[in-house]
Amino acid sequence: MAVTKLVLVRHGESQWNNENRFTGWYDVDLSEKGRSEAKAAGKLLKDEGFTFDFAYTSVLKRAIHTLWNILDELDQAWLPTEKTWKLNERHYGALQGLNKSETAEKYGDEQVKQWRRGFAITPPALEKSDERFPGHDPRYAKLTDAELPTTESLALTIERVIPYWNDVIKPRIASGERVIIAAHGNSLRALVKYLDDLGEDEILELNIPTGVPLVYEFDENFKPIKHYYLGNADEIAAKAAAVANQGKAK
């Protein structure tokens, strides 16, 4: 049976991950730890014999720079890459820039958990006059008004991620190309929910650690056979738990 593989990587720790702030579409860069995580991910992939034919990433530098570091470790800096806003992080609306723990102290752990991990719940929306609204950013100049979010739930994130998966990424993989996707916690949660057919309660508890390669294997009918992280299982579990704890009051 022919097995097709796909590699997903959440960007390495960003400067705002380090500061425990809601990031969303704000274009913050990797921290030093994040760059190290990305390089370690590339080394893991190299050690496991992975090479790629094509890469996808978002238009946010923390994902782009994660991909660059991975490809540098693989000696594949030349790899053809498509950047798309459809793989951006979920837009966190008016929460963008706020400290997660301080927000939890103000609104409660459960409310912040729902804002962070709930399926159909949107954080408070931005006003379009707010400088954080993506309509003011030239990289989104070609997006329609309907495509420019003032806030997003995971359900809304799925509405842009999954059509892009089905229309663009999946056909490339089905043609035999080896693909890596470097993206974000929630755009990858959207894809994982779809691939694994997870329920709303299941996706609420799913936390994807930064900078750890997640490998999916598919059968000839493009059904997932299994998925697994590369690396030390205990370290990966600890990183996922740390992600879950970011939204709790101190």
From Swiss-Prot:
Annotated family: Belongs to the phosphoglycerate mutase family. BPG-dependent PGAM subfamily.
SUPFAM superfamilies cross-referenced by the UniProt entry: Phosphoglycerate mutase-like (SSF53254)
Gene Ontology molecular function terms on file: phosphoglycerate mutase activity
Name this protein carries in UniProt: 2,3-bisphosphoglycerate-dependent phosphoglycerate mutase
NCBIfam families from the UniProt entry: pgm_1, PRK14115.1
Known partners and oligomeric status: Homodimer.
Pathway note: Carbohydrate degradation; glycolysis; pyruvate from D-glyceraldehyde 3-phosphate: step 3/5
Organism in which the protein naturally occurs: Yersinia pestis
GO BP terms in the entry: gluconeogenesis; glycolytic process
EC number annotated for this UniProt entry: 5.4.2.11
Keywords recorded for this protein, A-Z: Gluconeogenesis, Glycolysis, Isomerase
Site (Transition state stabilizer): H184
Reaction catalysis annotation: (2R)-2-phosphoglycerate = (2R)-3-phosphoglycerate
Keyword Kinase: no
Superkingdom per UniProt: Bacteria
Its job: Catalyzes the interconversion of 2-phosphoglycerate and 3-phosphoglycerate.
